[in-house]
Amino acid sequence: MLTISVLVFIVYVSIALAARDCFQCICQVESQCQPLDCRMDMGSLSCGYFQIKLPYYQDCGTPGRHSGEPVEEAWKRCSKDYSCSLQCIKAYINRYARMCPGKGGCELISKLHNGGPNGCHLERTVGYWQKVQSCCGCA
């Protein structure tokens, strides 16, 4: 029984490390992992480490938002805070992962992050996924 517990722990740690590498590579692809100011991207502003857009921030549950704080202010602040923006991405992925049947791991994370809820079905996310994959060597 101890052997199974150890094996489960090793698998859990391996998955956690792979996800960490995936998020780090997405950060590199998006901003060279720098807290960039907001900039226009495909008709709307993208901000911070992961180039988060306002609707994405709202979909991820507005982490870090203070009571009474305007959502735009919270979004810009969160996007420039690595921990807050990572929390946002994880919540977003958890919310929309069901939209990607047959996809898993870093491919699912990358395509949802880049293409939104339907990102796993969009041709335009393939090149983005290839950039992330070449960084981390993950699947």
Locate the predicted segments by residue.
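Short, functionally critical alpha-helical segments immediately adjacent to catalytic or ligand/cofactor-binding
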Residues: 19-34, 41, 52, 89, ...
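Cleavable N-terminal signal peptides of Sec/SRP-targeted secreted and luminal proteins
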Residues: 2-18
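Extracytoplasmic/secreted cell-surface and envelope-processing proteins
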Residues: 35, 121-123
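A general alpha-helical scaffold signature found inside nucleotide-binding enzyme cores
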Residues: 47, 127-130
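Alpha-helical segment that forms one wall of the substrate-binding/catalytic cleft
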Residues: 57-120, 129-139
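Secretory-pathway extracellular proteins and peptide precursors enriched for disulfide-bonded cysteines
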Residues: 14-18, 25, 127-128
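Secreted/periplasmic proteins that engage bacterial cell-wall peptidoglycan
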Residues: 28-73, 85
